[in-house]
Design a protein with these regions (language model features):
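Extracytoplasmic cysteine-anchoring/structural motifs
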Residues: 4-176
Length: 176
C-alpha cells in the first residue's frame, strides 16, 4: 500500500490488463439504409479467455481458463427491445457507430476472434468476420478495430494499437 503522509513516497501505477475496443458501423452503400440497426443488434464475441490470476507481488496478470466461444457482448430482447450489456457499450445515434470497450487479461490468441452480429433489421441474418481480429493482447496496450457490417459480410477497415494515455500524476493524503 502506498500512502503519502509524513514524508511517504508517491504512488505509481501501470496498466496490467489489455483494452480492446471494437467500433461497429454499417455500410449505407452496401445494403443498409438505416444505421440504427446496430443499436439493438445482438453481438457475440468468441476466442478470449476470461478467467485468470493476478500476482500482487510481481504485478503479473495471466489467463487460467478456457477459451469462451460465445460471449454475448450485447443481447437485445423484448418489445420494445432492451439491451443487456456484458461490457461498456455505447451507440452514437449521429454516426450509427456501436462501440464496445473491454478490459481483458493479457493473452496471445491461438485463433482469431470471431465477432458475430445479428442486426435489428427484420431479416434475421447474422454476419461474422473471418480471421480479421487477432491481436496479441499485451498488458498496458489498447487495441481498436473498426468493423463495417455489409450485406455480404463484415469488413475490417483499420486497427490501431497504442499505449494508454497518461492520466497525470496526482497526490493526496490519507489520514487515520
Amino acid at each position: 500500500m502506498c500512502i503519502r503522509d509524513r514524508g511517504g513516497n508517491d504512488c505509481s501505477f501501470k496498466h496490467k490488463m489489455a483494452r480492446l475496443i471494437l467500433k461497429v458501423q454499417v455500410s449505407n452503400t452496401d445494403g443498409f439504409d438505416d444505421t440504427a440497426v446496430l443499436e439493438f443488434a445482438d453481438y457475440k464475441l468468441g476466442g478470449l479467455v476470461h478467467e485468470g490470476t493476478f500476482d500482487v507481488k510481481t504485478g503479473t496478470a495471466a489467463t487460467a481458463g478456457s477459451v469462451v466461444s460465445d460471449w454475448m457482448l450485447r443481447q437485445c430482447t423484448g418489445a420494445p427491445k432492451t439491451a443487456t450489456d456484458k461490457c461498456v457499450a455505447t451507440f452514437d445515434a449521429a454516426t450509427g457507430v456501436m462501440t464496445f470497450t473491454m478490459i481483458l487479461l493479457p493473452q496471445t490468441l491461438a485463433n482469431a476472434l470471431v465477432l458475430e452480429i445479428s442486426p435489428d433489421d427484420g431479416e434475421y441474418q447474422s454476419y461474422s468476420n473471418k480471421d480479421m481480429i487477432k491481436p496479441a493482447l499485451e498488458a498496458g496496450y489498447s487495441y481498436t478495430y473498426t468493423i463495417t457490417v455489409k450485406k455480404t459480410g463484415l469488413t475490417l477497415s483499420g486497427s490501431t494499437i497504442e499505449n494508454w494515455n497518461d492520466g497525470g500524476s496526482h497526490s493526496g493524503d490519507a489520514k487515520m
